[in-house]
Structure formats: C-alpha cells, structure tokens
A protein has these predicted regions:
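GNAT-family acyltransferases
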Residues: 1-78, 83-86, 99-103, 107, ...
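Glycine-rich acyl-CoA binding loop
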Residues: 91-94
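Conserved GNAT acetyl-CoA-binding A-motif
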Residues: 107-116
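Conserved beta-strand-loop-alpha-helix junction that forms the acyl-donor binding cleft
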Residues: 115-125
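Conserved active-site tyrosine of GNAT-family acetyltransferases
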Residues: 128
Length: 150
C-alpha cells in the first residue's frame, strides 16, 4: 500500500478486482479490467504491474483507480489513471500519480514510466507535465506518449 497525505493507494486483490469488474457498465472498461485481472493471474509474481490499484481517501471513500500495464523488456511501465468526476479538480490525480510513479521508479527492473493520453485531455496532460513527464514525440492508439525516467 502507498499512503500520501490524503490518499491510500493499493493493488486490488483478485476478489476485489472481480467485484470491481462485475460492477462496470461500460463494456470497454470491463474488457480492459478483465485483461488486467488475466495479467495478474498469469503473472502472480508481478501482481502489482497488472492489477487495478484502488485510490481511496484516508476514510476509505473510493475516488478512482490507476494501473500499470506490465513491464516491457526495456524496463518501461505504462501508467493509466482516472479520478471519479465528483473528485476531479482537487489535486487527487497529481497526488496519486506522484506517489505511484515514485514507487515504480524505486523498483529494481524499472527504468522509466510512460503514460499515453488523449490529446484533448488537457487536465491529464497538465498532471503529467507537472510531475516532470516529457513528451516522447511518439503517438499511441490513444494519443501522445509522455515519459519520466529515473
């Protein structure tokens, strides 16, 4: 578990992920979260790198999720994150991503963390730039790719 001033961030258990997936009403999210659970089950020794990470306030209120999308052969881990609409604009994304990226960059096999963001998602781009992520000049399926190295 990662704790910040206002947040608790932790990799969900198999049961928590199953419950979370079952509650999803958006098919594309349900499929993505199912793929994460499949990654966890296929790589139990690297659970954190495939799991849904829950973002909660200190009182246990669930406000969002983040995830790493595995580790590639170069030691790069992609992060994805989202904060529920009711909690946006309060710095929670910056706080959660700062803590998660700091944790990731302390891990032995990690050289950098990347994030792919929709070009129109100005708030998410601001979060990444504020945290020292730099554009790579590459465009992924969702949009520009940003990178932060050790």
């Amino acid at each position: 578990m990662i704790e910040t001033k206002r947040l608790k961030i932790y990799a969900a258990s198999e049961k928590q992920m199953e419950t979370f997936i079952a509650a999803q009403s958006v098919d594309v999210l349900k499929a993505a979260y199912t793929e994460m659970l499949d990654g966890c089950l296929a790589h139990p020794d690297r659970w954190e790198w495939y799991a849904i990470w829950m973002i909660e306030l200190k009182d246990g209120t669930h406000i969002g999720e983040l995830c790493f999308k595995g580790i590639d052969e170069s030691g790069s881990a992609e992060i994805g994150y989202g904060i529920s609409d009711d909690y946006q604009g309060r710095g929670y994304a910056s706080e959660a991503v700062t803590a998660a990226v700091a944790w990731a960059l302390k891990q032995e096999k990690i050289n950098c963390v990347t994030a792919e963001v929709d070009k129109d998602n100005v708030a998410s781009i601001r979060v990444l730039e504020k945290l020292g992520f730099k554009p790579t000049g590459r465009i992924g399926e969702e949009g520009p790719i940003y990178r932060k190295a050790k």
